[in-house]
Swiss-Prot record:
Transmembrane segments: none annotated. PROSITE patterns: RIBOSOMAL_S4, S4. This is Small ribosomal subunit protein uS4. Residues 1-43 are annotated as: Disordered. InterPro entries: Ribosomal_uS4, Ribosomal_uS4_bac-type, Ribosomal_uS4_CS, Ribosomal_uS4_N, S4_RNA-bd, S4_RNA-bd_sf. Pfam families: Ribosomal_S4 (PF00163), S4 (PF01479). It comes from the Bacteria. One of the primary rRNA binding proteins, it binds directly to 16S rRNA where it nucleates assembly of the body of the 30S subunit. Keywords: Ribonucleoprotein, Ribosomal protein, RNA-binding, rRNA-binding. It comes from Prochlorococcus marinus (strain NATL1A). Residues 90-152 form the S4 RNA-binding domain. Coiled coil: none annotated. Signal peptide: none annotated. CDD domains: S4.
Length: 202
């Protein structure tokens, strides 16, 4: 299953607020479609599936990518769910979004893919790059790159920059000072349900 490129509000009407996907809020609270307003009891599988879809759409990753992250999270020490969220939060496109360099995660991914972002002084155009404590994330030192980031910083997608990201707005640069904290994950998610969803599939 490839990355979603369709109408974003249709997704947020079904899954709720996804700050990484879009800034816009859905005007109608019920899911899209002919039977969207009908209330029916959801199965446990449907609830787990919905939580999994929230992660996929918020972080803008494919099913195959998410499966890889689940496997990697399982192989690490500690809670698989927390490890999974940290892996997604540490993606370069998400870090740029959390810093305000991009309006959304897809917008931040474009910045990265087009070579506007450097990691430790080197242009890095891989959106899935795993950022770590000590890394310095910065906007490339040219006029076009700086204008893009400065425009986005005036109206950031999220109000607060997580405390482990030390942002210098004048230099358009930030240092990752610590590991990601579960508390600062912006999306409302029950990661344990995502782990349960994949328990028999991966």
């Amino acid at each position: 299953m490839s990355r979603y490129r369709g109408p974003r509000l249709r997704i947020t009407r079904r899954l709720g607020d996804l700050p990484g996907l879009t800034r816009k809020a859905a005007k109608r609270s019920h899911p899209p479609g002919q039977h969207g307003q009908a209330r029916r009891k959801r199965s446990e599988y449907a609830i787990r599936l919905e939580e999994k879809q929230k992660l996929r759409f918020n972080y803008g990753i494919s099913e195959r990518q998410l499966v890889r992250y689940v496997k990697k999270a399982r192989a690490q020490e500690g809670s698989t769910g927390t490890n999974l969220l940290k892996l997604l939060e540490n993606r370069l496109d998400n870090v740029c979004f959390r810093l305000g360099f991009g309006p959304t995660i897809p917008g931040s991914r474009q910045l990265v893919n087009h070579g506007h972002v450097t990691v430790n002084g080197k242009i890095t155009d891989i959106a899935s790059y795993q950022c770590k404590a000590g890394d310095v994330i910065a906007i490339r030192d040219n006029k076009a790159s700086k204008q893009l980031a400065q425009a986005n910083l005036e109206f950031p997608g999220l109000a607060n920059v997580p405390p482990h990201l030390e942002l210098d707005k004048t230099k358009l640069s930030a240092k990752i000072t610590a590991k990601t904290d579960r508390e600062w994950v912006a999306i409302e998610i029950n990661e344990l349900l995502v782990v349960e969803y994949y328990s028999r599939k991966v």
